[in-house]
Amino acid sequence: MPADYSSTARALALPISPLETPSSPDQHVERPPWSRRISSNVRRANNSASPYSNQPTTSFKDQILRKAEKLQRKFVSTWQKLSPLQKCLAVGAAVLNIILIALFLVYQHQIFASLAPFAERWRDMRGGWMILWAMTFVAAFPPLIGYSSTITIAGFVYGVPKGWAIVASATVAGSLCSFLASRTILSSYVHRLVGKDKRFEALALTLKHDGIKILCMIRLCPLPYSLSNAAVATFPTVHPLNYALATALVTPKLFIHVFIGSRLGSLAGDEEMDASTKLINYASIIIGAGLGATVGYVIYQRTMARAKELEIEELEAANGDVAAGRRVAAEYSDANNDDAALMNDDDISLWDNEDAQTGYTDFVDEDEADVFASGDLDEEGNIGGKGKTAGT
């Protein structure tokens, strides 16, 4: 029996589970694939699947139908928000535009004939081009309007080569001066004017990555001329000389407006023009206007798509930095726990006294007296003996 008690005590003293060993520094836990950032190469490879991809995932016809439905819903929602007075004014403006277009088509010859002498006197005036140059220059400052009209007048009065040279030089100079003024003396007004415009907020992010390229795209977008000058001035990463360079690089787009003006001048100056020539001029005007609007719209869509793509990349980079910081903090915490375990295992107390009486332990030394040799049985025997003695 004592031997059985000793073996049982030794068995109970054994640990139930193996001791944890400190993690090896060579072992690294591999992160799951979903936690990794998408590289730029993979993103470009899968760009067609992105909602902001420049490549259409549907047919051109479906895109046109979708755009038409979107415009219809927007028109209906806007119309429902108008008050009765606003609806009456909107209907009146639409009717007035139809009447003006009809009058222009009917009396176009008389209108152009009355404008022809005026254009001729302006063209023959000494220094007359400076008036047009000044008009284009002033139209660059916010919130003035009329920039497109001045370009068309340049083509109407001076034709394609000379008219383009006048408005191109005035555009570059006016844009630069408007940029500097919007960043200095007009800064508070500009921030109130365009500071909360979502279009320009989206374009601000792209300038951090694409530089002169995105500046050229902004200049090609069909945005209000004076407002775009003011908005770009609020972007701190844009240098004035870079902005002037981008404006100069996109001045060839002015040929479209100048060409339309020159065709109008031809219709006004030649009274004996036959029907076929007039038809060609009108077709040229319509094609030029449609081409300019289409190019501007496509560039605007691609610019905004690029802005959304860069915004997603910025968010991914920020989320990746946060995840990396949390992972490093977790690894640091695990390392501290491992060091503490090692210190506890190797801890040697300098105050141990082998002669002192130790406390309770589950381990039994065979050399020591068997603690179960005398115990409850002897005590019960003694009690039983005393009982018998008392009974006798």
Swiss-Prot record:
Location of this chain's protein in the cell: Golgi apparatus membrane
Record has Transport as a keyword: no
Residues covered by region (Disordered): 14-37
InterPro entries: Golgi_membrane_TVP38/TMEM64, VTT_dom
Residue spans, topological domain Lumenal: 1-87, 148-163, 262-278
Keywords from the named record: Glycoprotein, Golgi apparatus, Membrane, Transmembrane, Transmembrane helix
Membrane-side (Cytoplasmic) residue stretches: 109-126, 187-240, 300-392
Residues listed as glycosylation sites in the UniProt record: 46
Cellular component terms (Gene Ontology): Golgi membrane
Record region (VTT domain): 155-264
Main localization of the protein described in the UniProt heading: Golgi
Membrane topology term: Multi-pass membrane protein
Protein's GO biological process: mitotic spindle elongation; vesicle-mediated transport
Parts of the chain that traverse the membrane: 88-108, 127-147, 164-186, 241-261, 279-299
Keyword presence, Heme: no
Domain remark in the UniProt entry: The VTT domain was previously called the SNARE-assoc domain. As there is no evidence that this domain associates with SNARE proteins, it was renamed as VMP1, TMEM41, and TVP38 (VTT) domain.
Family to which the UniProt record says this protein belongs: Belongs to the TVP38/TMEM64 family.
PANTHER family: GOLGI APPARATUS MEMBRANE PROTEIN TVP38, GOLGI APPARATUS MEMBRANE PROTEIN TVP38-RELATED
Function: Golgi membrane protein involved in vesicular trafficking and spindle migration.
The protein's name in its UniProt record: Golgi apparatus membrane protein tvp38
Natural source organism: Botryotinia fuckeliana (strain B05.10) (Noble rot fungus)
Gene: tvp38
